[in-house]
Amino acid sequence: AGVIIGLGGSAGHSHKGHPGDSSGDMYRLATAQNFSAVTGACLMVKKSLYDALGGLDEANFAVAYNDVDFCLRLRAQGYVNVMTPFAAGTHYESKSRGPDTAGGERQARYEAERARFRQKYAPMLAEGGDPYYNPHFTLLYENYGYK
């Protein structure tokens, strides 16, 4: 599904943990809609556009946030990121590489990438985060709960 900027202090997945047959909160998983970003696990973009933007910024975001950064750079060029319910897939977050919060070098890399993301997008985060996310919903949890 889509990615919400500001969720958890940086960015997080909408509807994380919802069953595959769920229509989501307010039927959002069953409706095509714009998001500031979508997960790189199921990201489709023209190769020419990908190349024109320089692809994923692996120098600053080797593992985490590279997809979100790319989508935000797309938005800055006037494009939109659309989540469609008409393509289905299951995203097993970090299944192959393990969690970023497991400690050690992996967690240090994640924290550094998170800090770079927060610094690069500080103005957007300071303005309340995602323009596609209702400001009456919390940014603390991935559950569309009210503030």
Regions found by a protein language model. Give the residues of each.
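A short, conserved alpha-helix in the catalytic core of glycosyltransferases
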Residues: 29-54, 59-88
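Conserved donor NDP-sugar-binding/catalytic core segment of glycosyltransferases
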Residues: 1-10, 60
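C-terminal, non-catalytic tails of nucleotide-sugar-dependent glycosyltransferases
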Residues: 7-35, 39, 44, 81, ...
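Conserved active-site-proximal loop/helix segments of enzymes involved in bacterial cell-wall
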Residues: 92-95
